Amino acid sequence: MISTVVISRDRPAQLHLLLESIQRNGGNLFHLTVLFEASSEYFLEGYIKAQQFFSKKNRKDFNFPIRWKQRESSNLNEDLLKILSNSRELVCLFNDQNILFERVSSYKKIKKLFSTHSMSALSLRLGNNTVIQNPYESGNYLADRPKEGEFDLDRFLIWDATKIKSYTNFGMPFSTNGHIYHENLIKNVLKRTKVEDHDNFELEVQKGLYKGSFSGKIPPSMACTEYSVVICNSCERISDSIGKYDNTEIGINHRYIEGNIIDYDSFDFSNISKPYEDFTAFFK
């Protein structure tokens, strides 16, 4: 199993969707810990509801239990390091806007990939299909993708990330959108960086990488699955019959507290072309 941390702040309903998707498509690959932060008692109520739901469900369905940890430190990385103090050899980071929409390769194949290649990360959000970088900028529409690399174990693409444009999808080894790391590498990176707000994780860690803070410690190669299996969905577009709540995090949490959950089966994952989507979320 892969030691896996899901980072969440004020999004218990979206977290529920991710956990459901992992249980549907993750098999027994991920050993889950949720690191959550609630800015109010009402959001905390949402997290308690999610915890109770999955605790009951896991006993019934014989899923591995999910551990829950509330954020304590002003530096997010300190909390991550505490959780990962007794981690397994491989570590995966998700956040509460992710959805795992396809099955992932077996642990045996992923471990073999890391054993036979020196890599910074295996990305589950990238693949041959993620050709778009930014759909709202004509000059930055298409992703800077690897022009050369390897195809290993019939499932993984491997390339030199240092040859990719900085701060673009295929040039960013450090992400909480379904990236898998060797435990020693990610722990070293977390120790050398400070992240106060999860939304700045990619920017702060990548900034350290490009400044040379991890000089000589980060392999230039990274990898991805042949086709992406994870997306980040904003849930800014909502469709339901409840007219009294808006699409803000507060409104979404109100729906969740009242017993409505985001319907995983309402999403169409057949034409994914970028790691970030803006699908309409349907509540049921």
Map each language-model feature to its residues.
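A short, glycine-/small-residue-rich helix N-cap motif at loop->alpha-helix starts
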Residues: Q14, W68-L81, F101-E102
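N-proximal low-complexity "stem/linker" segments adjacent to membrane-targeting elements
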Residues: M1-S21
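C-terminal catalytic/acceptor-binding lobe
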Residues: G178, N184, N188-K284
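Active-site nucleotide-sugar/metal-binding loop of Leloir-type enzymes
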Residues: L80-L90
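Conserved catalytic core of nucleotide-sugar-dependent glycosyltransferases
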Residues: S106-K194
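Short beta-strand/loop segment that forms part of the nucleotide-sugar
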Residues: L29-E41
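Short beta-strand-to-loop acidic/aromatic patch adjacent to the donor-nucleotide binding site
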Residues: R88-I99
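Short, acidic, metal-binding catalytic loop of nucleotide-sugar glycosyltransferases
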Residues: E20-F30
